[in-house]
Regions:
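Membrane-interface junctions
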Residues: 24-32, 36, 70, 145, ...
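Alpha-helical transmembrane segments
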Residues: 29-37, 67, 71-74, 163, 174-190, 218, 249-254, ...
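Membrane-interface helix-boundary signature
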Residues: 27-34, 64-68, 133, 140, ...
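Binding/recognition "hotspot" determinant
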Residues: 1-37
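Alpha-helical transmembrane segments and their helix-start/interface "positive-inside/aromatic belt" motifs
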Residues: 26-30, 60-84, 185-194
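Non-cytosolic segments of integral membrane proteins
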Residues: 75-171, 195, 199-255
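Hydrophobic transmembrane alpha-helix segments characteristic of membrane transport
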Residues: 40-71, 168-182
Length: 255
């Protein structure tokens, strides 16, 4: 299993404890506050409707239309707030479907090296003359480990971000009801979808690594191969860092 195999997991499968915390906080702490905000926005929407009715001369047909539209908006927005978790789960499922589809074409991958650096160092003949080579290999080995740690951290941070979104989401969704602030909810949903889709992009990018490593060949000295492997790993690291930018560009393009 590679580093990207965990990206196919659901939020509950990846860490059921954190998923439970997010659900509990959303239901027990954030939801009551969100419903209170929603009630305030409902009052403001009703006030705005009365202002529009007054400006239109209190026409009966227009009055009925405005009140009906406001009531429909209130019902829909309350449903959205109460079912925030289901909405986010649906968005996450869309992203997961993309990731699973990608996994059918790109296998799992991880930051490793076909150059066995530790054994290469151990196999070097003794003597001062080989110390520079050993030091080079040690430096490359440590840098590869750092790349590996950073990639793992970014993968984990993506899940942590989703748990935080799930815990606090209903506050943003509550703004859907109020015309002046509904963009907050829309932008929040775009951001959530971007983070969810980042899993698919990360799976794809990390899955590319074995192909990059395989393109190095076996020519050259052991140090040349090691530095070439490090270069490919750095390319992977840059792509992993840019994964969030890729998905935000996709979701921001949505109307």
């Amino acid at each position: 299993m590679g580093q990207n195999s965990g990206l196919l997991s659901s939020l509950t499968d990846w860490n059921s404890t954190l998923a439970g915390y997010a659900d509990s906080i959303s239901t027990g702490v954030v939801m009551p506050v969100a419903l209170t905000l929603l009630a305030l926005f409902m009052i403001l929407e009703l006030y705005n409707a009365t202002q529009r009715i007054a400006m239109n001369g209190s026409n009966n047909a227009f009055t009925i239309q405005q009140i009906a539209l406001v009531m429909l908006k209130i019902v829909v927005c309350r449903w959205a707030v109460v079912h925030t978790t289901e909405i986010l789960n649906a968005l996450f499922e869309v992203a997961s479907t993309v990731a699973v589809g990608i996994s059918g074409y790109v296998g799992s991958g991880e930051v490793n090296t076909t150059v066995d650096i530790e054994n290469a160092i151990a196999a070097l003949p003794g003597g001062i003359g080989n110390m520079p080579v050993a030091l080079e290999l040690m430096v490359v080995g440590w840098m590869l480990r750092i790349v590996n740690i950073v990639v793992n951290t970014i993968v984990a941070a993506r899940f942590i971000e989703l748990y935080v979104y799930n815990a606090m989401a209903s506050l943003s969704i509550a703004t859907l009801c109020y015309q002046e602030l509904h963009g907050i909810a829309v932008n929040f949903l775009k951001s959530y979808l971007a983070v969810a889709l980042q899993g698919a992009v990360l799976y794809l990018v990390i899955g590319f690594y074995p192909a990059l490593a395989g393109s190095l060949g076996t020519g050259g000295s052991i140090t040349e191969q090691a530095w070439a492997m490090l270069g490919q790993s750095v390319i992977l690291l840059v792509a992993v860092f840019m994964s969030g930018k890729f998905t935000k560009a996709i979701t921001n393009a949505m109307a």
